[in-house]
Amino acid sequence: MFMGEYDHQLDTKGRMIIPSKFRYDLNERFIITRGLDKCLFGYTLDEWQQIEEKMKTLPMTKKDARKFMRMFFSGAVEVELDKQGRINIPQNLRKYANLTKECTVIGVSNRIEIWDRETWNDFYERNLKKSFEDIAEDLIDFDF
């Protein structure tokens, strides 16, 4: 399970350190792809296989299902951690998520998310307008 928030930098070659707390669960190779809200999603290979199976059930007769699958899978790439715990983020994904230098990596249960730090801070501040409790209350019945 992934949790926490970590600030890192993208170097001039498009490499970024993955937080050490995430590396063990991600293993040496994992998948990154376009995520929602202009961030990147990162999945273990096992989790990716499960997502792929779920996506196969989407009706291809629905235009939005086709669009979503195209965007999601065309952006997917398998990355490998180097000896320093870094991954190389391809240019097309850096552009999609507006990653320049300052980045934030967060854990969200079954995935990691890679954000441009300013975009993450804006998202976080914007969503604090609705309190954490209000958001929880609006969700389907869920007990901690």
Curated annotation (Swiss-Prot):
Keyword Electron transport belongs to the record: no
Subcellular location, principal: cytoplasm
Pfam families referenced in this protein's UniProt entry, alphabetically: MraZ (PF02381)
Keywords of this entry: Cytoplasm, DNA-binding, Repeat, Transcription, Transcription regulation
Subunit structure: Forms oligomers.
CDD domains (alphabetical): MraZ_C (cd16321), MraZ_N (cd16320)
Gene3D superfamilies in alphabetical order: Transcriptional regulator MraZ domain
InterPro entries in UniProt: MraZ, MraZ_C, MraZ_dom, MraZ_N, MraZ_sf, SpoVT-AbrB_dom, SpoVT-AbrB_sf
GO cellular component terms, semicolon-separated: cytoplasm; nucleoid
GO MF annotation terms: DNA-binding transcription factor activity; transcription cis-regulatory region binding
Annotated protein name in UniProt: Transcriptional regulator MraZ
Every SpoVT-AbrB domain range: 5-47, 76-119
Stored PANTHER family: TRANSCRIPTIONAL REGULATOR MRAZ
GO biological process, one term: negative regulation of DNA-templated transcription initiation
